[in-house]
C-alpha cells in the first residue's frame, strides 16, 4: 500500500499543484508522501511561492522536517485557499463523500477543506467503500464537558459510541483543540444529511463526514491511478 500512496501523491501534485498557490495540508500517512514530494519539487525550483496552511501538529512537524515554511494562524485569511490536499479513511466514490478523523484532526481538516476552492483527496485502494461506515467508525469531536450528554444522546439513538483512548497517555485522546473524540459505529445512508444532523447537537464541534462541493479524488485501483 505504501507504493500506492507514493504514486497517487505524486500524480496529484504533478497534475493539480501549481506555483503561487495557497495550499491547505492535511494529516495522515498519505500526506507524509505528499509533503516529501512537494519538498523535492520546491528544492528543484519546479514549484515556487507556495504558502502552506496546516491542520495539525503532526503536519507542522513534517513540514518543519522538510524545511518548508508554513502558516498556522488563519485569522488574517480573508479568501479561500486554492487547494486543500488530504487523505481519507473511507471514500464513497459515487457521492465523493468521505470519512476522515482517525488521526484526530478532522475539525481543522474540515476548516481548511471547506475554505478551499478544491478539496484534493489522495488514497490507496483500501479506502474505497460502497457505504461509509463499512470499515471505520465515524469520528466526532466533542467538547470535554459535553461528552456525557452526547454519549447518552447517541445511546438513545441506538448507536454505539466509544471514547477514544490515547495509548501513550493512558487516558482520553485530546485533540489539538483540547477536545475529546467519540468513535461512532454506524452505516451512513445519507452522508450530507448525517453531517448536517449531527452538527445540530450542542457539544459536537465537528463530525468526520466530509461533503465538499468541489472534491477531486486521486486513488489507486485495479493496478492503476484513477480520478473521480
Swiss-Prot record:
GO biological process: D-ribose metabolic process; pentose-phosphate shunt, non-oxidative branch
InterPro entries, per database record: NagB/RpiA_transferase-like, Ribose5P_isomerase_typA_subgr, Ribose5P_isomerase_type_A
Reactions catalysed, as given in the entry: aldehydo-D-ribose 5-phosphate = D-ribulose 5-phosphate
GO CC entries: cytosol
Catalytic machinery residues: 109 (proton acceptor)
Pfam families in UniProt: Rib_5-P_isom_A (PF06026)
Binding site for substrate: 27-30, 86-89, 100-103, 127
Pathway in which the depicted protein is active: Carbohydrate degradation; pentose phosphate pathway; D-ribose 5-phosphate from D-ribulose 5-phosphate (non-oxidative stage): step 1/1
GO MF annotation, one: ribose-5-phosphate isomerase activity
Keywords: Isomerase
EC number: 5.3.1.6
Role description: Catalyzes the reversible conversion of ribose-5-phosphate to ribulose 5-phosphate.
Family: Belongs to the ribose 5-phosphate isomerase family.
Subunit annotation: Homodimer.
Descriptive protein name: Ribose-5-phosphate isomerase A
Amino acid at each position: 500500500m505504501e507504493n500506492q500512496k507514493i504514486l497517487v501523491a505524486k500524480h496529484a501534485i504533478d497534475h493539480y499543484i501549481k506555483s503561487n498557490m495557497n495550499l491547505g495540508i492535511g494529516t495522515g500517512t498519505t500526506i507524509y508522501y505528499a509533503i516529501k514530494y512537494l519538498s523535492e519539487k520546491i528544492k528543484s525550483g519546479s514549484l515556487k511561492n507556495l504558502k502552506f496552511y496546516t491542520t495539525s501538529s503532526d503536519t507542522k512537524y513534517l513540514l518543519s522536517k522538510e524545511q518548508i515554511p508554513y502558516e498556522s494562524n488563519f485569522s488574517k485569511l480573508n479568501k479561500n485557499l486554492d487547494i486543500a490536499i488530504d487523505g481519507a479513511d473511507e471514500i464513497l466514490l459515487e457521492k465523493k463523500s468521505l470519512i476522515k478523523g482517525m488521526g484526530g484532526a478532522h475539525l481543522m481538516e474540515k476548516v481548511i477543506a471547506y475554505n478551499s476552492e478544491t478539496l484534493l483527496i489522495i488514497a490507496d485502494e483500501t479506502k474505497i467503500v460502497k457505504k461509509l461506515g463499512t470499515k471505520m467508525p465515524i469520528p466526532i469531536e466533542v467538547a470535554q464537558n459535553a461528552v456525557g450528554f452526547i454519549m447518552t444522546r447517541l445511546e438513545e439513538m441506538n448507536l454505539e459510541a466509544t471514547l477514544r483512548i490515547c495509548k501513550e497517555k493512558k487516558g482520553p485522546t485530546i485533540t489539538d483543540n483540547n477536545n475529546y473524540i467519540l468513535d461512532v459505529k454506524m452505516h451512513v445512508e445519507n452522508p450530507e444529511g448525517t453531517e448536517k444532523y449531527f452538527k445540530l447537537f450542542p457539544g459536537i464541534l465537528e463530525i468526520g463526514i466530509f461533503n465538499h462541493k468541489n472534491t477531486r479524488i486521486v486513488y489507486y485501483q485495479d493496478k492503476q491511478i484513477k480520478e473521480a
